[in-house]
Amino acid sequence: LSILEKKMIQFASVRCSEDAWQKRTKSARMVFRQVREMKEIMIATSNAHKVEEFTQMLAPLGYQVRSLLDLEEAIDIEENGTTFEENALIKARAAHERLHTAVISDDSGLAVDAMDGAPGVYSARFLGYDTDYATKNQYIIDQVKDKERGAQFVCAIGYVAEDGSEHVFTGIVRGEIAPQISGEKGFGYDPIFYYPPYHATLAEVSEEQKNAVSHRGRALAKLIAFLKGEGQ
């Protein structure tokens, strides 16, 4: 349900005196006005976790957030870019062309120095979609054995405004490939990404600690700063 629908159901479900009714009518009008004034923004993802994260960041700025989960028909988007930035804009551009509204999309992954930046944009499908991350992580550890262990998580957020103008914001967190898989928190490549300031992998720290330095958080901060300036 939309914000408006939820508010109106709540409004209609309460029986009250004439005085209270007038107050609630005034409140309902304010809700209508607030919803009309809200700017809509589409998150080009079907990942519920990402939708929640973006919503928490954008709602305070007056945005009504929607996602691909709200659409009756799926949008098929081929991510064929060679960089995170290209893929982020490809997804945002495709959704904008279909929906004609402001769109945000992101692409992220792990880039290992000793592997010439791999798995990079292929992080999700590295060694095949059906390969579990324990296998992927051990493979990377074996590849960097006795080599440079530097690595970075990268997140690029593509933003296509309602008028079609395009922008991209990149967040990076540097670290090292751990000598062994460590930690049971997080997901993906977190158990092998050692973050020196924490003296631990990202799978060994709390979600709050991870989010404080995450690549997505850093990219989001840049997007938020831009949107705040755009609204002035």
What is each residue range found by the language model?
Residues 12-14, 20, 28:
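Short hydrophobic alpha-helical segments enriched in small aliphatic residues
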Residues 6-8, 23-27:
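Polybasic, lysine-rich low-complexity intrinsically disordered segments
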Residues 39-42, 48-232:
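Anionic-ligand binding patches
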Residues 26-37, 229:
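Short, Lys/Arg-enriched N-terminal segments with co-localized hydrophobic residues
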